[in-house]
C-alpha cells in the first residue's frame, strides 16, 4: 500500500492532469485586506494515483434580473442600481459588485428567437450574491421609479455555473496549463499536490480512463455495559421505562402504597449491589425495604462517568423527587423540567421521567467503540491492498491485517483519524454508515472530548467540519435520515443505501446482499472439494453459503477449485459469499476475554469491511455513478447525497447557457395545492386469462416519453404562452390536447380539456429539452456500440477499431471514423475486444446514466418543486404517449386481425391468433408469432413521426394475465428454445409478503406455465396447506418485512410501527430506525378479543424463537395465500372438479349489467369476485374449518368415526 502521507512536487512547465473526485466552494477572507473572495476547490487524483487540490481564485458568481415593466435601462439607471445595492451591502463587500446589461432569450414560452435585455449582476464573493438575491425580492428605486425585478438563475450554484462555462465534466479529467504551486497557507489542503490557477486555465481533457482512486471501507464494533444494543450517549431512559413498568405492576393497588418502597429497593441495584447501597445510605434507607415486594422486577445496572459517586446524595434526591415521579406516572405533572417546545406535543410518561432522572442523577457512560476496521483498494484492482484494525485492548496478530492496539477509546478514535490522513481516501464507504457508524463515532468522540480529531478528517487544512443530519426523500428509498461527519474533499458512499435504491431484495442485511451478488454455480463437487464456475472474490478464511442453506468456511483456493470445512453429500448447485456470524453477545463476551478472543472480533470486523470493497467492485458503484454525475453535470457526491431535481436542473442550465437562454426563477407557493390534475400514462383494459395455446407478443415503443417530447417539440421555449407569437407567418404549429381531472381514484372526474400549442422550428430544429434528449439518446446508442468494439490487427501490423461483422471468409469493420474496411481472414493476425472488463463496466454505467437521465427529464418537468416545472409539458407528453398506444392497437387489429389483450404505458401485448389462422401449436406457433411481430413493427414504423419506433421486444408463451399491471409468463425473445419466467405486479414481486407466498403461489404458477395441468396445481396446493398447518415450513418462510417510516397519521394502526415501538421498550438500542425494514411473523392470539390491533398480532422472529410463541397459520392462509391464489385459479374455474357451469356466470353477468345500468366493467368485477369465492369454497374452506376447530378446541364430526380429515 502506497500511503499518501507525503507531498509531491509538480513541474510547472507541464500541464497538471487529473480526474476530479469532489468539489468544495466557499468565501475566503484575506486577513490583511479584509476582502472576501470566492474560491472553488477541485479535489482529484492524477494518473499516478497522487491526490491533488486545485484552487480556482477568480471565478465570479452571478445571476440575472429583468423587469416586466421596463425592458431597457440607461447607463445612469444601471449606475443607480449598482450604487443602491452596494450601499446595502456590508462594508467589506463594497467592491464586490459589477452590473452589466446583456441580451438573452427567455426559455419560458415561444418568442420566435426574440432577444430581450437582462441585467447581469456579478460578485466577488458568494455572500454578497446571497444578500443581493434577498434584497431584490422587494421593489427597488431605479432613477425616479420603483422597479420590481424578476430573478433569473439565482438558484444555480456558482461552481456548477463554472462547470458549464468551462465545458468540463464534474467527474471527468481536467488539464491545467498555467498554475502555481506557491499556494497561500490558508488555501493549502492535505492533498499531496496543491496548486492555484485562474478559471480560464481549467480545460476538459478527453480521457476514458479512471484514475487509481483510493476507496476505503470502514466498520465499527461496540460493546454494551447492559448487554443491550450499544448506545453511544446514554441517558436514564431505560431506568425510566423500568419505573413505568414497576408502577404498572402495582395498578391493582388503588393507592399504589407498595410502589414507593419497591421503587427504592429496585433503585438500590442500579449503581452497585444492595449491601453496599445499604451501608452508604443506611441513615436514609429503611432496611425493611429489603423485605418489600417488587413484583419480580429488577432494574438494569447503569455505569456513571465518574467512578466514585455519592450514593447518599443520590438517594436523598430520589426521595425528594418521589412525589414528582408519582405525579408523572399519574399523568398530572406540570413541572417545568418536562415542558417541550416541539410541535406542542405532550411528552410521554417515559420521556418525562427520563428528563427528570437526567436532571439529578449522575451522567452515564456511553457504550464504547472497541474496534474500527478499515480496508482499502484502488479502482482497477480486484483485491484490497491494505487491511487495518484498531482495537481497544490487546489483540493477537491476524495474517494480512495491520493490527493496532490502544489502551483507551480516545486513543482508538485518534488512531483511526490518523489512518484517514495517511491513506487519504477519495471515497469512504461502508454498510449503513449513514445510519449507524458515523453517528456513533461522532457521539462517542463528543462524550470523550476528542471530537476535534473526528471533525478534522477533511482534506481542508486547519478546518473544523460539521456533523450533519440530513433528510433525503426519494421514490426509490422513501424518507432517509442521513447522519454523517462532513469530510470535504472525500465522497461518502453508503453501500446499503445504494443497494436499496437500485435493487429489489428480500433482505438488505450485508450477509444476504453479499451472497446475492457475489455468487455463482458449482460445476462439480466431491464432499469438501468444489469446482466453481468462478472463484473470483473468494479468499482463504472466507465463508460461503451453498444452495442458499449451508454456511461453510473456505480452507483453500486453487484457481476455481476450493476446499471447505464441511462434508456435504447432497447435490450442491449454487454458492454465494457469506460472512462469519458473530452475535452481539459474542462480541461483548470476546471483548472481556483474551487477545485471541478480541482477534476473533477483529477478523469479523475486517471481513465486513472487505465485503463492502468487493461489492463496490462487483456492482461497479464508482463507474456507474461517476457516469451519472458526468452526464448530469453534478459532482459525484450529489448522486448519493442529493435528489433528482438538481441533476436535471444542472443539465438543462448547461444547455440553456449554450443556446443563450435564461431560466426564470419559479416562485413556489408552499401553501397552495393544485386542484386540477391531468391524465397519466395509458393502461389498456386487459382480457384476463391463461393463454396456453396462444403466444402473446409484446411490442414496445423505444423511449416513449423522451421520443414524444422530441417528435412534438415539447419544450419551455416552444410552447405558445403569448398570443402575439401564435399563428406567425412561416411558423408551423402542433396542437396537443389533454384531459383535465379533479379527484383521485374512484372520485376522479374529467372536468375539461386543454390544448397546448407547440411551435415547430425551421429546418427541423428542436427546443431545449428535445435537444438534450436527442443528445442523451444518441450518446447512449453510440456508447452501447462502443462496448462491442473490437480491435483487428493484420499480419502487416495495421490496426482497425470498430464494430465487426464476421462471416466465413471475411471480416467487415465499421471503424470509429465511419470508414468500412473488409479483410479476408488470411490477412488477420488477431481480433480482440477493444475494451477490458473495467472499461466495459465504465461504458455500461455511462449508457445506463444516459437512459435514466433521459427518462428523468420528463419527471422533473412534472414535479411541482422542480426549477423547470411546467405542468403543460408533462401533460402533453403523456397525452402524446397515450395517442401512440391507441394508434398501435388500432393498426394491429385492423391490419393483422389481432387481439390486443393488454397495453401498458409504452407497450402492447398482441395475440396474432396463429392457432386459428395457421393451425400452429407449441414452438411453431411461437416462432410464427415472433416473425409476424417483427414484420408488423417494421410496417408500422412508416406510420410514425421520427424518432418513434415500435419494436418487437418479447413473446410470452404461455401467458397468464390477472388484471392491469399483473401478469406472468415464460418470456422468449428470438430463440424459441430459450426462455425465462417474467412477472409484473403479482405477489411474487412484493417484498412485504412472506416467502411462503413465493413457495406456494410460485409453485402453482410454475405448474400452470410449464406443466399446464390444473389437477397437479390443485394437488400441490393441498399438500402445501397440509405442510403449513403441520408446521413443516421453516419460520423464515413466514417472515414478512416492511419499511418503517418516520411518521404515520395513526401509528397505532400500523402493525410494524407498533412492533418497533414494543421492541424499543424492550431494548432501545436494537430497535429499528426510520427506513429500516422490520421483520415479523403473525402469532396466535385470543380471537374473541375484537379490540386487538394488528400490531398486537405480530412479533419479531427472534422473540418468537426465544419464547416459543405459536405461529398463526390461519392468518397466512387467509391473508397471504388465499386471495392471490383464488384470483389466479378463478381464471381456470371451469376446469376444476365440482365447479359451477359457465352458463351460470354468463347469466349472472347479463343480470348484473342490467342492475348496474349498463356498467359492464362493474358487472365483470362482481362476477370475478363470485368466481373467487367459489374457488375459496372448493380449495380452502375445508382446511380453514379444521384449523378453526383446532384453535377453539372443538372436536370435528369425523373424529367420532375415527376418520382423519384431509
Swiss-Prot record:
InterPro entries: DNA-dir_DNA_pol_B, DNA-dir_DNA_pol_B_CS, DNA-dir_DNA_pol_B_exonuc, DNA-dir_DNA_pol_B_multi_dom, DNA/RNA_pol_sf, DNA_pol_B_thumb, DNA_pol_palm_dom_sf, DNA_pol_type-B
Enzyme Commission no: 2.7.7.7
Keyword Cell cycle: no
SMART domains, per the entry: POLBc
MF terms in GO: 3'-5'-DNA exonuclease activity; DNA binding; DNA-directed DNA polymerase activity; nucleotide binding
A single BP term in Gene Ontology: viral DNA genome replication
Keywords linked to the UniProt accession: DNA replication, DNA-binding, DNA-directed DNA polymerase, Nucleotidyltransferase, Transferase, Viral DNA replication
PANTHER family to which the protein is assigned, alphabetical: DNA POLYMERASE CATALYTIC SUBUNIT, DNA POLYMERASE DELTA CATALYTIC SUBUNIT
Homology family: Belongs to the DNA polymerase type-B family.
Protein's recorded name: DNA polymerase
Amino acid at each position: 500500500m502506497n500511503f499518501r502521507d507525503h507531498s509531491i512536487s509538480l513541474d510547472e512547465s507541464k500541464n497538471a492532469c487529473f480526474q476530479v473526485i469532489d468539489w468544495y466552494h466557499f468565501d475566503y477572507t484575506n486577513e490583511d485586506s479584509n476582502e472576501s473572495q470566492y474560491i472553488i476547490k477541485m479535489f482529484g487524483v492524477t494518473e499516478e494515483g497522487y491526490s491533488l487540490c486545485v484552487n480556482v481564485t477568480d471565478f465570479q458568481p452571478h445571476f440575472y434580473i429583468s423587469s416586466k415593466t421596463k425592458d431597457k435601462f440607461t447607463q445612469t439607471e444601471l449606475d443607480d442600481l449598482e450604487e443602491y445595492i452596494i450601499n446595502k451591502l456590508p462594508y467589506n463587500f463594497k467592491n464586490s459588485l459589477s452590473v452589466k446589461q446583456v441580451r438573452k432569450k427567455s426559455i419560458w414560452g415561444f418568442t420566435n428567437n426574440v432577444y430581450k435585455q437582462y441585467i447581469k449582476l456579478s460578485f466577488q464573493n458568494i455572500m454578497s450574491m446571497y444578500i443581493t438575491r434577498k434584497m431584490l425580492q422587494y421593489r427597488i428605486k431605479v432613477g425616479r421609479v420603483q422597479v420590481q425585478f424578476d430573478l433569473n438563475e439565482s438558484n444555480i450554484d456558482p461552481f456548477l455555473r463554472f462547470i458549464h462555462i468551462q465545458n468540463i465534466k464534474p467527474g471527468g479529467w481536467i488539464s491545467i496549463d498555467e498554475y502555481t504551486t506557491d499556494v497561500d497557507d490558508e488555501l493549502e489542503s492535505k492533498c499531496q499536490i496543491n496548486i492555484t490557477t485562474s478559471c480560464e486555465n481549467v480545460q476538459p481533457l478527453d480521457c476514458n480512463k479512471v484514475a487509481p482512486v483510493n476507496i476505503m471501507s470502514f466498520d465499527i464494533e461496540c460493546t454494551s455495559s447492559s448487554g443491550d444494543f450499544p448506545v453511544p450517549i446514554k441517558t436514564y431512559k431505560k431506568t425510566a421505562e423500568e419505573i413505568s413498568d414497576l408502577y404498572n405492576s402495582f395498578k391493582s393497588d388503588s393507592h399504589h402504597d407498595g410502589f414507593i418502597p419497591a421503587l427504592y429497593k429496585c433503585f438500590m441495584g442500579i449503581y452497585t449491589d444492595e449491601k453496599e447501597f445499604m451501608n452508604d445510605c443506611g441513615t436514609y434507607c429503611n432496611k425493611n425495604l429489603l423485605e418489600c415486594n417488587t413484583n419480580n422486577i429488577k432494574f438494569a445496572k447503569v455505569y456513571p462517568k465518574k467512578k466514585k459517586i455519592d450514593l447518599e446524595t443520590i438517594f436523598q434526591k430520589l426521595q425528594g423527587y418521589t412525589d414528582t415521579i408519582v405525579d408523572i406516572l399519574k399523568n398530572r405533572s406540570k413541572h417545568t423540567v418536562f415542558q417541550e417546545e416541539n410541535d406542542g406535543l405532550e411528552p410521554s410518561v417515559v420521556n418525562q421521567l427520563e428528563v427528570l432522572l437526567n436532571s439529578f442523577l449522575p451522567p452515564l457512560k456511553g457504550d464504547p467503540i472497541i474496534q474500527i476496521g478499515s480496508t482499502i483498494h484502488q479502482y482497477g484492482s480486484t483485491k484490497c491492498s491494505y487491511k487495518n484494525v484498531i482495537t481497544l485492548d490487546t489483540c493477537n496478530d491476524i495474517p494480512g491485517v495491520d493490527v493496532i492496539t490502544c489502551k483507551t477509546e480516545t486513543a482508538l478514535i485518534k488512531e483511526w483519524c490518523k489512518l484517514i490522513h495517511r491513506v487519504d481516501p477519495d471515497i469512504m464507504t461502508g454498510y449503513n454508515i449513514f445510519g449507524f457508524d458515523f453517528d456513533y463515532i461522532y457521539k462517542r468522540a463528543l462524550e470523550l472530548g476528542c471530537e476535534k480529531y473526528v471533525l478534522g478528517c477533511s482534506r481542508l487544512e486547519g478546518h473544523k467540519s460539521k456533523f450533519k443530519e440530513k433528510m433525503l426523500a426519494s421514490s426509490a428509498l422513501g424518507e432517509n435520515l442521513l447522519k454523517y461527519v462532513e469530510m470535504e474533499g472525500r465522497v461518502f458512499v453508503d453501500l446499503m443505501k445504494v443497494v436499496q435504491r437500485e435493487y429489489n431484495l428480500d433482505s438488505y442485511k450485508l450477509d444476504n446482499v453479499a451472497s446475492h451478488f457475489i455468487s455463482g454455480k458449482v460445476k462439480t463437487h466431491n464432499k469438501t472439494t468444489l469446482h466453481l464456475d468462478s472463484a473470483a472474490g473468494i479468499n482463504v478464511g472466507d465463508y460461503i453459503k451453498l444452495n442458499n442453506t449451508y454456511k461453510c468456511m473456505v480452507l483453500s483456493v486453487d484457481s476455481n477449485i476450493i476446499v471447505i470445512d464441511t462434508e456435504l453429500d447432497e447435490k450442491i448447485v449454487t454458492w454465494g459469499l457469506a460472512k462469519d456470524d458473530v452475535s452481539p453477545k459474542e462480541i461483548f463476551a470476546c471483548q472481556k476475554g483474551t487477545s485471541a478472543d478480541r482477534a476473533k472480533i477483529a477478523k469479523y470486523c475486517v471481513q465486513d469491511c472487505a465485503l463492502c470493497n468487493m461489492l463496490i467492485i462487483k456492482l461497479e458503484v464508482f463507474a456507474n455513478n461517476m457516469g451519472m454525475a458526468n452526464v448530469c453535470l453534478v459532482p459525484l457526491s450529489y448522486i448519493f447525497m442529493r435528489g433528482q431535481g438538481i441533476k436535471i436542473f444542472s443539465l438543462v442550465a448547461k444547455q440553456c447557457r449554450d443556446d443563450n437562454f435564461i431560466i426564470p426563477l419559479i416562485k413556489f407557493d408552499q401553501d397552495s395545492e393544485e386542484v386540477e390534475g391531468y391524465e397519466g400514462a395509458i393502461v389498456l383494459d386487459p382480457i384476463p386469462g391463461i393463454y396456453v395455446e396462444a403466444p402473446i407478443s409484446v411490442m414496445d415503443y423505444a423511449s416513449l416519453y423522451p421520443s414524444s417530447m422530441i417528435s412534438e417539440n415539447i419544450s419551455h421555449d416552444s410552447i405558445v404562452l403569448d398570443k402575439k407569437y401564435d399563428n406567425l407567418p412561416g411558423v408551423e404549429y402542433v396542437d396537443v390536447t389533454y384531459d383535465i381531472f379533479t379527484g383521485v381514484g374512484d372520485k376522479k372526474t374529467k372536468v375539461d380539456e386543454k390544448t397546448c400549442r407547440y411551435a415547430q422550428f425551421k429546418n427541423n430544429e428542436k427546443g431545449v429539452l428535445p435537444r438534450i434528449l436527442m443528445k442523451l439518446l444518441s450518446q447512449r446508442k453510440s456508447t452501447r456500440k462502443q462496448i462491442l468494439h473490437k480491435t483487428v490487427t493484420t499480419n502487416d501490423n495495421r490496426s482497425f477499431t470498430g464494430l465487426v461483422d464476421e462471416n466465413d471468409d471475411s471480416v467487415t469493420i465499421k471503424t470509429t471514423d465511419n470508414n468500412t474496411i473488409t479483410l479476408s481472414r488470411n490477412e488477420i493476425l488477431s481480433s480482440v475486444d477493444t475494451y477490458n472488463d473495467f472499461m466495459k463496466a465504465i461504458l455500461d454505467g455511462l449508457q445506463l446514466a444516459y437512459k435514466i437521465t433521459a427518462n428523468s427529464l420528463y419527471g422533473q418537468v412534472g414535479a411541482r418543486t422542480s426549477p423547470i416545472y411546467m405542468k403543460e409539458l408533462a401533460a402533453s407528453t403523456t397525452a402524446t404517449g397515450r395517442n401512440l398506444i391507441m394508434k398501435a392497437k388500432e393498426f394491429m387489429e385492423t391490419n393483422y386481425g389481432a387481439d390486443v389483450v393488454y397495453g401498458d404505458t409504452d407497450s402492447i401485448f398482441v395475440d396474432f391468433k396463429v392457432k386459428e389462422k395457421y393451425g400452429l401449436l407449441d414452438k411453431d406457433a411461437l416462432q410464427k408469432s415472433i416473425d409476424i411481430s417483427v414484420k408488423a413493427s417494421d410496417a408500422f414504423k412508416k406510420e410514425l413521426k421520427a424518432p418513434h419506433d415500435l419494436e418487437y421486444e418479447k413473446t410470452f408463451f404461455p401467458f397468464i394475465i390477472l388484471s392491469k399491471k399483473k401478469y406472468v409468463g415464460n418470456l422468449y425473445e428470438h430463440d424459441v428454445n430459450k426462455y425465462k419466467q417474467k412477472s409484473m405486479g403479482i405477489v411474487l414481486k412484493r417484498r412485504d409478503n412472506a416467502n411462503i407466498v413465493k413457495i406456494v403461489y410460485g409453485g402453482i404458477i410454475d405448474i400452470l406455465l410449464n406443466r399446464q395441468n390444473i389437477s397437479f396445481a390443485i394437488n400441490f396446493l393441498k399438500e402445501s396447506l397440509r405442510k403449513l398447518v403441520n408446521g413443516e415450513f421453516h419460520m423464515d418462510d413466514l417472515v414478512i418485512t416492511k419499511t418503517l417510516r418516520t411518521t404515520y397519521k395513526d401509528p397505532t394502526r400500523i402493525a410494524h410501527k407498533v412492533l418497533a415501538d414494543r421492541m424499543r421498550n424492550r431494548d432501545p438500542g436494537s430497535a429499528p430506525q426510520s427506513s429500516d425494514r422490520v421483520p415479523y411473523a403473525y402469532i396466535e392470539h385470543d380471537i374473541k378479543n375484537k379490540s386487538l390491533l394488528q400490531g398486537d398480532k405480530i412479533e419479531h422472529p427472534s422473540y418468537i424463537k426465544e419464547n416459543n410463541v405459536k405461529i398463526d397459520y390461519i392468518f397466512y392462509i387467509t391473508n397471504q395465500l388465499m386471495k392471490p391464489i383464488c384470483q389466479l385459479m378463478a381464471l381456470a374455474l371451469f376446469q376444476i372438479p365440482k365447479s359451477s357451469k359457465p352458463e351460470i356466470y354468463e347469466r349472472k353477468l347479463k343480470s348484473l349489467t342490467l342492475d348496474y345500468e349498463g356498467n359492464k366493467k362493474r358487472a365483470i368485477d362482481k362476477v370475478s369476485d363470485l368466481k373467487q369465492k367459489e374457488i375459496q369454497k372448493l380449495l380452502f374452506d375445508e382446511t380453514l374449518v379444521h384449523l378453526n376447530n383446532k384453535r377453539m378446541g372443538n372436536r370435528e364430526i369425523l373424529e367420532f368415526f375415527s376418520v382423519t380429515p384431509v
